[in-house]
Amino acid sequence: MAPGLDLTPDFHPPTTTTTTTNNAPPQQRTLLLAPPTLATHGEARLATLFTTTYPRATTDLQMLDRLAAGLVTLPATTYDLVLVLTDPDGSRRAEAAALLADRAVWARLVPAVRAGGRVASEEGGGEGTEFLGDQRVGREAVLAGLVAGGVGGFVKPEYAEEEAVPLRFGKKKAAAAAAAAVSSAGPAVGTVKVATATSAGKKEEVGMVPPAVAAAAAAPAGVGFVDFSDDLDLDVEDDEDVIDEETLLTEEDLWRPIQQPPECQPQPGKKRRACKDCTCGLASRMEAEDKARRAKADSDLNTLKLKSEDLNELDFTVQGKTGSCGSCYLGDAFRCSDCPYIGLPAFKPGEEVKIVNNAIQL
């Protein structure tokens, strides 16, 4: 075997890793909101702003109309200043105010502003909640969570982080204070033996605990008693005024027509129906009408019912005798459903009808 050379180093120096921490504050970023006309007729002015006042590296430009249409998504908590470009003379103020009066624009804009960031206009000014000379724009900004700034515009407030604070009732401290309050003579005694004038020289036990304290000590643990006769020293008059509900409505209110909700109005060609949770009285009125209609139908039906003594057999074989309808002899086509001559052929009034061998003989 041919000899070989080991070229790996025998000395391994320790390797150290250096970690650099960047504690520098975040870079200030600015968002410029431009009306649509500024993009078509203000290219030179935008170039001047980027070269003189707002560096392009830390400045973003968005169009107000695209933001209002929801075509732009802004990064969250990014901008320290949101500047609405309206020209120093305010020539584009009305155009920008018309777009910022939409609540959806502020809903997309405010989350992109950092805590403590400002929303201002290029022309400045504005008192109170007025922004771009329009109270509506300022109202929408306040409803979105901004507060009016002192130098015009609005500021996003810095809210402190929520922190849970435990509630301690100090039961241990109260128990320690009660134990320290006991005198050095020992614990309190409940009864003592003393000689009285009526005891004839004998000592009697006398209670040293007040009755109220003794009753409270005799109560079981965890059970409380409420004295409903105690008014807690509140100045409450016994003769409280009770409002009569019948006096809340006047005669004019009672005669006023009921305003029918739109959902209760019947559709064309359909019968009016009441809602499940009807409160206008339509359901009760329709129920009363149904009951009255059913009662009338029952009464009409009872008038048509005949008793057993009224159902006398009518002899059609006698000349001149006819049924109540007068058409029994004409045939089944003219007979009632309960006619006893159903199935018989037509015959003449007074004609004798015989049945021989289950065959009808006229």
Swiss-Prot record:
One Gene Ontology term of the molecular function aspect: 2 iron, 2 sulfur cluster binding
What subunit structure does UniProt give?
Monomer. Interacts with TAH18. Interacts with MIA40.
Entry function: Component of the cytosolic iron-sulfur (Fe-S) protein assembly (CIA) machinery required for the maturation of extramitochondrial Fe-S proteins. Part of an electron transfer chain functioning in an early step of cytosolic Fe-S biogenesis, facilitating the de novo assembly of a [4Fe-4S] cluster on the scaffold complex CFD1-NBP35. Electrons are transferred to DRE2 from NADPH via the FAD- and FMN-containing protein TAH18.
Q: Which GO annotations describe the biological process of this protein? A: iron-sulfur cluster assembly
Sequence motif Cx2C motif 1, location on chain: 325-328
Matching entries from HAMAP family are given as: Anamorsin (MF_03115)
**Which domain of life does this protein belong to?**
Eukaryota
What's said on domains? The C-terminal domain binds 2 Fe-S clusters but is otherwise mostly in an intrinsically disordered conformation.
| Annotated motif Cx2C motif 2, positions | 336-339
The residues that the entry says bind [2Fe-2S] cluster are 264, 275, 278, 280
Q: Which Pfam families match?
A: CIAPIN1, DRE2_N
Q: Where is this region: N-terminal SAM-like domain?
A: 24-165
Protein name per its UniProtKB record: Fe-S cluster assembly protein DRE2
Instruction: Read off the lineage from the record.
Output: Eukaryota, Fungi, Dikarya, Ascomycota, Pezizomycotina
Q: Which UniProt keywords apply?
A: 2Fe-2S, 4Fe-4S, Cytoplasm, Iron, Iron-sulfur, Metal-binding, Mitochondrion
Q: Which residues bind [4Fe-4S] cluster?
A: 325, 328, 336, 339
